[in-house]
């Protein structure tokens, strides 16, 4: 009769406790079934779900590439200016050398 001691204790418990346990197990069962259904849906529609996460960047986040593009343009412009200044300096040097040669 040792095995029936637990049953005797359950009979003495209030009915609301049994109802609470039933509701709790129903909720757990429902959560498991919904999770399983979502898993099956995800397997079936994997491409649709991945398309959501690979959307093109919004206008707010596109300012960073523009910033870096403008930085590269500024650097390119600086390099071109330095190159043109160096060419002008070289041309002036060669002109002054030719003038000195013609004077001699």
Curated annotation (Swiss-Prot):
UniProt GO cellular component terms: membrane
Transmembrane parts of this sequence: 20-42
InterPro entries: SMIM19 (IPR029368)
Topology in membrane: Single-pass membrane protein
Major subcellular location class: membrane
Keyword annotations of the record: Membrane, Transmembrane, Transmembrane helix
Localization terms from the record: Membrane
Disulfide bonds: none
Alphabetical list of PANTHER family matching this protein: SMALL INTEGRAL MEMBRANE PROTEIN 19
Similarity comment: family membership: Belongs to the SMIM19 family.
This protein's name: Small integral membrane protein 19
Organism, scientific name: Danio rerio
Organismal lineage: Eukaryota, Metazoa, Chordata, Craniata, Vertebrata
